[in-house]
Design a protein with these regions (language model features):
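C-terminal substrate-recognition regions of SAM-dependent nucleic acid methyltransferases
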Residues: 1-163
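Short, amphipathic C-terminal "tail helix"
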Residues: 164-177
Length: 177
């Protein structure tokens, strides 16, 4: 897990609209654009990899439960950046991998209710940082992980499972990324 702003780009960085031939793809809170390679100050080890990025701001319902059903989403942004993609200080890299499939498995792991419940236990503000993942165990991302797999692996009983299921909202990752 990287620190916030793994590429040395501030939250105000918006990039440029088109690739001038010497650019990386940029993800900022304003969306996608391009940034000249020489402006990227750090994180060279992540650039050629598939990256799972996590937004530093929690979902609006992280600290307080949804009024309708009492659930929380916790993570607002969870996405995959392809090789030669970078991001601003609004995100950190939750994992960097040589192939898309492994990155997808990592992304789906972070989207599980199990992981988001453990993350919620360390949140005290609207910002997520890597130290907030203190209770989240690392996995082998060569395979997919579901909540059921994790409940079994860590020996959760029915009461513990019901607590997690009642508190954490399902997370829809949308398309492939």
């Amino acid at each position: 897990m990287s620190p916030l702003g793994p590429f040395g780009l501030g939250t105000a960085e918006r990039g440029i609209e088109r690739d001038l031939g010497n650019c990386y793809k940029l993800r900022s809170s304003a969306g996608n654009s391009f940034i000249k390679r020489n402006l990227v100050k750090s994180g060279a080890e992540y650039i050629p990899k598939w990256k799972v990025i996590i937004g530093k701001a929690t979902s609006a319902g992280a600290a307080t439960a949804n009024k309708k059903d009492g659930t929380r989403k916790v993570i607002a942004t969870l996405d995959i950046l392809e090789p030669n993609g970078v991001c601003t200080f609004s995100y950190f890299v939750g994992g960097a991998f040589d192939d898309y499939e492994t990155a997808k498995n990592c992304q789906e792991y972070y989207a599980t209710k199990f992981v988001r419940f453990l993350l919620l236990q360390c949140l005290s503000s609207i910002n997520i940082s890597r130290d907030r993942f203190a209770f989240v165990p690392l996995q082998d991302f060569s395979r997919k992980w579901t909540d059921e797999d994790l409940y079994e692996k860590y020996g959760l009983n029915e009461e513990e499972i019901n607590l997690i299921e009642s508190m954490i909202k399902p997370m829809d990752l949308g398309g492939d990324e």
